[in-house]
Design a protein with these regions (language model features):
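C-terminal, non-catalytic "cap/extension" segments appended to globular domains
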Residues: 1-133
């Protein structure tokens, strides 16, 4: 949705008919969609939750939260694979508690994430968890 949303809202000429919006949506889908939705899909005309009420950009915070969550959980998966235990690895849990939970809002969230994972978040774990990689 983000690319479509940015392209739609960066146009300098007003859109005068719905077919132009659907054509833009199809252009974006052709470029980035892993799976093409059915041709009858009219998402821009029906998904008012994201496109109305000033909420549009804030909606993407949900996907960002999924990226952080999946990447953090991947640390537990990696420990389980390395140690042959379950994902309830004590050492990884301790690092998570200290870097994320104990720090709370005392520092920027990215600093806490980096303290836990040793790097910035990536999308690989999310793609894997959602069956896309």
């Amino acid at each position: 949705f983000s690319l479509f949303d940015m392209l739609l809202h960066s146009q300098t000429e007003p859109v005068t008919h719905g077919d132009a919006i659907l054509a833009l949506q199809q252009q974006v889908r052709d470029e980035v969609a892993v799976l093409q939705p059915p041709a009858y899909s009219r998402t821009p005309h029906t998904f008012s939750h994201i496109f109305a009420g000033g909420y549009s950009a804030g909606y993407y915070s949900y996907k960002w939260a999924e990226v952080l969550s999946a990447d953090a959980y991947a640390a537990f998966e990696e420990a389980a694979q390395k140690n042959g235990h379950s994902t309830l690895d004590v050492e990884t849990g301790r690092r998570y508690r200290e870097a994320i939970l104990e720090a709370g809002g005392s520092r920027p969230a990215m600093a806490s994430f980096k303290a836990f994972r040793g790097r910035e978040p990536g999308i690989d774990a999310l793609l894997r968890h959602q069956g896309m990689a």
